[in-house]
Amino acid sequence: MTENTGNKDTTLLKAVKSGDIKNVSALLAYGANVDTTDNHGNTVLMLAANLGYTEIVRSLLDAGANINLFRKTYHLTALMLAASANQIDVVKLLISRGANVNAINEDGSTALMIAALKGYIEIGQILLGAGADVKITDKDNDTALKLAVKHKHPVMVKALTQNNNIVNSQDRGGETVLMMSADLGYLEIVQALISSGADVNIKNVDHQTALLAATATGNTDIITALLDAGAEINHQDQEGETALHLAVVEEYIDVVKILLQRGADVQIRNHLGDTPLLIAAFQGYSDIVAVLLAAGADMEKKNFGEVALTLAVSQGHFPTVKLLLDYGADINKLADDGKTALVKAITANYPEIFQLLLAKAANVNLQNSSGTTALMWAVAEGYSQAVEMLLQFGADVNLKNQGGYTALMIAEFNNYRGISKILREAGARE
C-alpha cells in the first residue's frame, strides 16, 4: 500500500466504523495513526468501543492506542462510550488493559454513573468489581446511586448499595436516596433501599423523614412500606408537623385513615399549636374531620383561642359545622375573643350557619365577659335579618353589657333606624 498517512488515517476510521477487522489490522501494520480522530473528536478506539467491536478494540490496544484519552467534546473516554452502549465484552477488555474506571467527563460523570442512569446492571457490576468509586458526585450533585434512583432502576440500586455504606449517605441538605425515592413515588426503589438496609428514620436538615416525604405526595403504598420498616409515625419536623398533620393539610383521607390505624397521635400539636382536627376544621375538610372525630380527636382543644367549631364557623364551612355539632361540640363555647360560634356566624354574615346554630339551640342570651350578647353583635353589624331571627328565638331585647348599653342604644348610636324600630316593636325600652 502506498497511501499517505492522512489517507491511511481516513481509511482506518472507515474500516473501524464498518467493523472490518482485516482492513484495520492491515492499516495499522502500514503505519496508520492508532489514535486518529474523526470530526467529532472520537478516536478509533472510542468508535470501536462504542460500536462493540471487541476484536478491533483489542487490535487497537495491541497497537498502542491510548486507552484513557478524552474526547474533545464532553470529555468522554472509550470506557464511558462502551458503558453507555452496554458493550459488556468491550468494557471487560478495556478494564483488563488499564482503563481508568473513575475518569470524569465534562459533567463530572463516570462510566459507573452512565451505567447507573441507563440501568445497565452487568456493566455496573463489572465497574464496581473493578473499583469504581460510588461516592463520586457530578456537577448536579448526583451520585451513581442517585441516578439509578431517579431513573427507576431497582436492581441497579441494590447492586450499588451492596458491600458499602452509601445507602444512608446524605447530601448537603441531609437528603437520603430513600427520601428522594419516597418523594418521587418510586415504590420498587423504596423497597430495594429498605432491603439494602436504608434507615427509614434519618432526618434531613429540616428534620423531615422519608415518611413525611411520602405523606406529602399521598403515596399509600410507600407510606405502608415505610411504616412496616419501622418509620416513626409521630415524628415531628422542625415546624412540629407530623405525617398526620401533612396528610390533613393535603386532604389525603386514605393516608389519614392509614396513619390513624397504625397509631398516629390524633391530639398532637405542631409548633403553631394546631392539632390535625383544628387544621381540618379550618379548611372545611368534613370527611377528614369525621375520621379524626371517630378516632377520638378532642373538639375542645384550642389554638389561638379558637376551637374546631368556631374555626369552621369563621370560615363558613357549613357541612363541617353541622358535623361537629352532630358529634356534640359545645355550641356555646366562647373563643378567646369573646365570641361564640353564633356570634361569629353573625359577624361573618353566614346566614345559613347562623340559622343552623339557632336550630341547634344555641344560647341567644349568652353574655361574654363584657356582657355582649349575640343580639348586640347583630345590631352593631347592622344585620336586620339576624336581629329578627334572634328575637324569634327568644333574644332578650333589654339585656345590658358591662358599659350599660342595650341593643337599642347601640342601634340608635349607629343611626340604624330600621333596627331601632324592630327592637322597639319587640319591647325594647329606652
Describe the residue ranges of each PLM region.
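Ankyrin repeat A-helix N-terminal signature
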Residues: K14-G19, L47-Y53, L81-Q87, I114-Y120, ...
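Ankyrin repeat domain, specifically the short helix-to-loop turn at the C-terminus of the second helix
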Residues: S25-A32, R58-N66, K92-A99, Q125-A132, ...
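Start-of-repeat signature of ankyrin repeats
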Residues: K8, G41, Y74-H75, G108, ...
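Conserved ankyrin/ankyrin-like repeat signature
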Residues: N23, E55-I56, D89-V90, E122-I123, ...
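Ankyrin-repeat-protein effector appendages
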Residues: M1-T11, A130, A159-I166, R172, ...
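Intrinsically disordered, low-complexity regulatory segments in ankyrin-centric signaling systems
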Residues: M1-Y30, N39-N42, D62, E430
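Ankyrin repeat boundary/linker residues
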Residues: T5, D38, R71-T73, N105, ...
